[in-house]
Amino acid sequence: MVQIKILVNCALPYANGPLHIGHIAGAYLGADVFVRYNRLMGNQVLYVSGSDEYGTPITVRAEKEGRSPKEIADIYYEEHLRTFENLGISFDIFMRTTWPEHSENAQDFFIKLLNEGYIEKGTMIAPFCRKIGRFMPDRYIEGTCPYCHYPKARGDQCDNCGRTLDPQDLIDPKCILSGETPEFRETEHFFLRLDLLEDRLKSWISSKNFWKPNVLAYTQNFISGGLKKRPITRDIDWGVKIPLDGYDSKRIYVWFEALIGYITGAKEYSKRTGNPDLWKEYYMDPEVRNYYFIGKDNIPFHAIIWPAMLMGYGGFNLPYDIPANEYLTFKGQQFSKSRGIGYSVDDLLKAVPADYLRYYVASILPETGDSDFSLEELVNTVNSDLIDKYGNLVYRILSFMDRYSINPDPVDVSGDEEFKYAQRSFELWSEDLSGVHVKRGLLRWLDLAIYANGFFNRSEPWKTIKNDRQKLNHDLYLSLKITEVLTVMVYPYIPSSAEKIWNMLGIPFAIGQSYRHLYEMHAFSVHRGAIPFEKIDLESLVSKLNN
């Protein structure tokens, strides 16, 4: 098997509030499963995310709480790190856009694109709140979306239909701080000339027929009406400074500089590992595929604006795939902690183990359309799949062996129909995950788990122990080999539990090395232990969430 290098960039969450399970389903769980799969296969992966700390969502929260934006960013940077860690998501580096190194990288991009003619100075109309006496950033303006008529659309984007907006596009716009209708006044800013890169972008997008249909359609629709120059600076004082004289009251806007955070993260990781040029291998070697895991609302920034910035700068790999997910809803509504819709990740982790949550969310990932989160379905899915099918299989095999003090000798089962079925399941699962079909890969695993239970039942070891020890040895060994394959396949989804079961099976190599040895007929040194699954019930789950 040829090993390859892969760069996985995961959307930078705003450091302005807790992560809810909609965030995890949108970008982070799928990315983590994909990264763990590739590492199982022996591929080298650089896994980067970070904290988006210069956005107006941070300043909005800071003003509401009477804190500085940096205080808010510090609080949620640490909280997000803990949440990801508790959920078993571990990035190689989780950068911060407030790092000085990031400002340097963003300013370098700004100057290079300016010198190449892809950034120009101009004027724009911006909302000015007379009551407060200053220009207001886009996010400080809310109103009705002119496209879908959602009443809480922001001045930069409608979260309901996903369209990017300008504040003056809104119907009945209001300043969120004063409640006043803003005036629209002229102000000087810098613009990214997306129009100059439109033909190159269209040509590049035409080669992406393997993208998810929803992502490709969204991108093609976005660009079909023609691209316009887009402002990349704002009248704010919280952000990366414009590296030119005379613009002290303006900053580079977040949607431009935050994208550069992926490169900042890769550079910082390279420095920390003692190889400062390592990042270039991931960004400049055309053989390295770059994946960007994001939510639906980030598609235009990653499929249009970021590639345009990379094209304008020159020398960088463009995104290979952008497997953006749709929305995970709660009772048909988008998750919103502030509006009391749904649950934060931390709330749920107090009520259920991380692997239970990972498994259920993976089973309902909104990969090509919205899906709905349900506590009832969480309970049913975990109990039915993880416990009744997988956990029960492991328990029955190991308890039988323990009861009769049996540890089967290795035997060649490579020609057996059941082992060939497991091999084919693994190959299809591998195709699914290499193509970022995370939910489909889980269904492959579940199918094999059902098949493995059926084989164990048909083999009837409780009978062959009495009259056919050779068949007993063969069938038990075959059940162990299929369970080994099952455990490798489920590891990217529930890593902690899978590793515990792996150790119980007594397999003579680490699960991370399994791709090299999976079809070897090695010995098992089985030792029975507590199966890492317990059934959950809805009543106790709700009680824990409410306490």
Curated annotation (Swiss-Prot):
Residue runs in coiled coils: none
Is this entry keyworded rRNA-binding? no
A GO biological-process term: methionyl-tRNA aminoacylation
Where is the protein situated, by its record's location annotation?
Cytoplasm
**Cellular component per GO?**
cytosol
* UniProt keyword annotations, A-Z: Aminoacyl-tRNA synthetase, ATP-binding, Cytoplasm, Ligase, Metal-binding, Nucleotide-binding, Protein biosynthesis, Zinc
Q: Which domain of life is it from?
A: Archaea
- Where in this protein would one find the motif 'KMSKS' region, according to its record? 334-338
Secreted recorded as keyword: no
Q: What is written in the cofactor note of this entry?
A: Binds 1 zinc ion per subunit.
Q: Which reaction does it catalyse?
A: tRNA(Met) + L-methionine + ATP = L-methionyl-tRNA(Met) + AMP + diphosphate
Q: What is its EC number?
A: 6.1.1.10
User: Primary place of residence?
Assistant: cytoplasm
* Entry's Gene Ontology molecular function annotations: ATP binding; metal ion binding; methionine-tRNA ligase activity
Name the cofactor(s): Zn(2+)
Annotated InterPro entries: aa-tRNA-synth_I_CS (IPR001412), Anticodon_Met (IPR041872), Met-tRNA_ligase_1 (IPR023458), Met-tRNA_synth (IPR014758), Methionyl/Leucyl_tRNA_Synth (IPR015413), MetRS_core (IPR033911), MetRS_Zn (IPR029038), Rossmann-like_a/b/a_fold (IPR014729)
Residues annotated as binding Zn(2+) are C145, C148, C158, C161
Q: Which residues bind ATP?
A: K337
The similarity annotation says: Belongs to the class-I aminoacyl-tRNA synthetase family. MetG type 1 subfamily.
Q: What does this protein do?
A: Is required not only for elongation of protein synthesis but also for the initiation of all mRNA translation through initiator tRNA(fMet) aminoacylation.
Under PANTHER family, the record lists: METHIONINE--TRNA LIGASE (PTHR45765), METHIONINE--TRNA LIGASE, CYTOPLASMIC (PTHR45765:SF1)
In terms of NCBIfam families, this protein maps to: metG
Record-given protein name: Methionine--tRNA ligase
- Per the UniProt record, the source organism is Thermoplasma acidophilum (strain ATCC 25905 / DSM 1728 / JCM 9062 / NBRC 15155 / AMRC-C165)
**Where is the organism placed in the taxonomic lineage, from the top?**
Archaea, Methanobacteriati, Thermoplasmatota, Thermoplasmata, Thermoplasmatales
